[in-house]
Amino acid sequence: MTARKVTKELTITNKLGIHARPAALFVKTANQFECDIFVERGGETVNGKSIMGLMMLAAGPGSKLTLHTDGKDAARAAGELEDLVKHKFFEE
């Protein structure tokens, strides 16, 4: 049985942070999963399936984010989104 709720701490390491292209890639990946996905920064929580929500976090390089996934495919979603962030959104 896989976890229904997963929380991961992420650090933004790409040069420009989460701007339009990384936000779109994150949302495209997130929308492949049925689970709920939320991203938190500095006490503000946004829907991880919303480009505008992610961009409102103003997450620049070095920003610390908390990823919350909840649902039947939560573990897989969290893993794929963590890989995306770790690989700098494939920008570099």
Predicted regions and their residues:
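Short, charged helix-to-loop "capping" segments that act as catalytic/coupling loops
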Residues: 2-5, 90-92
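Intrinsic-disorder/low-complexity, polar/charged segments enriched in Ser/Thr/Lys/Arg/Asp/Glu/Gln
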Residues: 3-9, 64-66
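Hydrophobic alpha-helical segments and their boundary regions
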Residues: 6, 42, 76-77
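Compact, glycine-rich, soluble single-domain proteins
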Residues: 11-52, 56-60
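C-terminal structural segments of small proteins and small subunits
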Residues: 60-92
